[in-house]
């Protein structure tokens, strides 16, 4: 009997590291703060405190495509983006987005994808970032790699988005537009990783993370 009492604390110590493994006691699911496929959110540039934004205003130069800007207002409905994979099958609704995964960001109100290409941006002469496509379908220049430090993209983390096709980072350096979008900031691509290209998930509708896409709900 005494032998059994001595073994019980040892057994607890042996099991403790297993209990601390993320998701082990929850069907191996990631932490509830993981950003998931299908979620709709706003993205804040942490350096300049503006949210990624688009609208039915086209660039007057460069590609002439729909412009992408940064806005200070937190309640602007044109700042919502849907998280999607390179294909819908590669990023099923409720699946947590992994660090290093390629995604698409689809503008909710216009159905166009975050996009960049070899046109100069109008204010800083960096690489133009636009919104492109119809009903969520564009081309191979709509893909962005989520750069973060853990296993999954967590909502509280500052992350970078690196463009697959041209290897620039989604950035803001503070240049402001005049009429008709006065005060909005230029969004562009920069070749170097720096403090201008950190983004954080903010307001939105987040699908509860699950490694089983059949099991999900909204937070």
List PLM regions with ranges.
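Lectin-like carbohydrate-binding module/patch detector with strong preference for beta-trefoil
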Residues: 2-219
């Amino acid at each position: 009997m005494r032998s059994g009492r001595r073994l019980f604390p040892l057994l607890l110590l042996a099991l403790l590291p297993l209990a601390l493994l993320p998701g082990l006691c929850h069907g191996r699911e990631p932490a509830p703060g993981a950003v998931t496929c299908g979620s709709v959110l706003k993205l804040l540039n942490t350096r300049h405190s503006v949210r990624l934004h688009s609208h039915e205003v086209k660039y007057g130069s460069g590609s002439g495509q729909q412009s992408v800007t940064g806005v200070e207002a937190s309640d602007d409905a044109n700042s919502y983006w849907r998280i999607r994979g390179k294909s819908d099958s590669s990023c099923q609704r409720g699946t947590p987005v992994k660090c290093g995964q390629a995604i698409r960001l689809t503008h909710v109100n216009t159905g166009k994808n975050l996009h960049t290409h070899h046109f100069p941006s109008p204010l800083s002469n960096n690489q133009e970032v636009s919104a492109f496509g119809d009903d969520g379908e564009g081309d191979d220049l709509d893909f962005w790699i989520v750069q973060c430090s853990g296993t999954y993209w967590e909502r509280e983390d500052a992350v970078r988005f690196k463009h697959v096709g041209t290897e620039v980072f989604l950035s803001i350096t503070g240049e402001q537009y005049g009429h008709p979008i006065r005060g909005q900031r230029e969004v562009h691509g920069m070749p170097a990783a720096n403090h201008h290209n950190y983004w954080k998930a903010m307001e939105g509708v987040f699908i509860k993370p699950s490694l089983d896409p059949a099991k999900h709900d909204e937070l």
